[in-house]
Amino acid sequence: HLSLRRQRQMCIRDRLSSLAQHISHGDYSARLHIHSGDEIEALANDFNNMADTIEDNISELHFSMEKQEQFMGSFAHELKTPMTSIIGYADLLRSQNMSEDETNEAANYIFSEGKRLESLSLKLLDLLVVKNQETILTPTDPALAVRNVINVMKPELAKEHITLKSSCRKGCCMMDIDLFQSLIINIIDNARKAIDDNGLIHVAGTVRDDNYVIIIKDNGRGMPPEEITRISEAFYRIDKSRSRAQGGAGLGLAICSKIAEIHQAKIKYKSAVGRGTVVTITLPNIKEAAHHE
């Protein structure tokens, strides 16, 4: 009996040693399955519990690292447009003879975009990292948000021979204007990446019943039906080679979904290959009386 017990103990020892090697080489799912009803089974259970803890900790570490990478990608993507605007207007001041009014206008754009950059960076930090901080929404005319975006993006799009037009009627919605402008910027920027030559992006806004509806339409290359349901997923790209060439982390539309959720808004995508894309944003419109109460 002692000989059999010793052999059994050696067998268990070898299995424990083998399991430890598996775990040390990254196989965190390896486990011992022993049902002997004695202290050896208890030892195996202790070892399995230890392996469970290691696997959980490693998974949590990987998840945390992935979230950090996503945040850095999102952050860089979101700050690109205001930074481009600031650099563009600063370059105008540096390289061209401008009138006093033009100089003041460019300086005001640089200042306002710098302040927006400061505000947006803090809000994105809350949105993407903290997530549990409540966003403060105030009554705002969505046409103002669109107009601000048009003023910032129009000069840069013109350099790429893309015309940006807008026709928005006045409304009143509960919103965080910085975050909502980020939503509009992301959608327009996504349209830009889908346009080859002689591009046109049109932004229209109007009140429909109890909603304010913003429609962003482009004449780009469009998307196949199977891609539409996936375009708001983080890191998903319709044309990965094009996206790498033009920059961006692939998180813009995923952020749009988060911002829309904060504003109780709905985003609908309609597209066809070769015919462009239409993005419809619908958000609650409050009455003017409520705005002045």
Model-derived regions: residue spans:
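Short alpha-helical segment of the dimerization/phosphotransfer core of two-component systems
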Residues: 112-117
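Short helix-loop "hinge" at the ATP-lid/N-box region of the Bergerat-fold HATPase_c
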Residues: 190-192
